[in-house]
Amino acid sequence: TSTNHTFKNVNMTLLNSTLNYGEVKSEKETRKITNSNYHIIMESTDRNIRRDAYEKLTSKIAEFKNIFAENLVSNMKNTSSMAEIRKFPSTLDSLLFSSNIPNSVVDSLYKVINKNLNVYQKYLKLIKNSLGLKELAYYDLNAQILTDEMSFSIEDAQYLIGEATKIYGEEYHDIIEKAFNEKWVDYCSYKGKASGAYCTSCYGAHPVVLTNFFGKFGDVSAVAHELGHAVNFYLSQQANNKHDYNNDIFVAEVASLTNEIILSNYVIEHSRNKNLKLIALYNLINLIQNNLFDACLEGELENKAYTLIDNGETIDAEYLSSTIYDLSLIHI
């Protein structure tokens, strides 16, 4: 909806081009913190750099927490109102309607995740021990625990992705090559560009991928991820009309995450570099962390907030902050 787009645009404008997060300094360089390169900085082996970047970014965002909260809550209230107008029992039911999924599936997912948090916590303990820390802080979660001085060029990324996706067959591989040759991917990072990676598609035109490429294996994996969406959109356009070509959000990540898994498995199977094999394995673990445990943590926050809004209660920045903090304590 237009309201949803406005919510996203306000957030992206603030995070990516308006807020100034300052700089972090090391013995080698001074680096400006942006919403795009923050995740790279947080992989630093220097804990002081990680802590400095974390405190500067989060404190700056905290200055505008009421604006972010009001923007989020306004969007959620609109979604809740539309669910009520359309006679859904809850907002969650309305959001799951197009996927034909009962909300009991979501409840079951959260229960299973919470029941198996010991697996995730065992991984966090491994990170803590690998870093030689007595206590693990939030800014330690993405610290590089492997010796990762490897750098990948765009051409390296294209080669690895091309080789890994040959497993799908000639048609799929040809579309991947077409995407590279016709420059479907925007790799560069610059001020104002959205952080992370995205794929967008308009019926009748080829998909476009936006990413922020810094030369790490994770960046190669991100390109593979978004190209999974791109090929999916491309083939779906060929097989469907413009009213039916879009896929359902519940299964949208299948095409993309499968590509990341295939890429990492390809490297593990074919590389002769032991460290690169470990980096690829580490990437697989991060996929589980980000797309299962972290996603469910954020989903629980959203679900709790929608329940209150559906019942006519008021939520604000303090509620959102305290709730995500309490949920994080359970997970971590």
For the regions a protein language model found, what residue spans apply to each?
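His/Asp/Glu-rich acidic catalytic environments and adjacent acidic regulatory segments
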Residues: 1-104, 108, 112-115, 163-164, ...
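A metal-dependent hydrolase signature that marks the N-terminal structural subdomain at the beginning
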Residues: 91-171
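Auxiliary, metal-adjacent structural segments of Zn-dependent hydrolase domains
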Residues: 140, 147-203, 216-217
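Post-HEXXH active-site segment of zinc metalloproteases
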Residues: 233-254
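Post-HExxH zinc-binding segment in Zn-dependent metallohydrolases
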Residues: 247-274, 290
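Conserved small/polar residues in nucleotide/adenosyl-binding loops
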Residues: 330-332
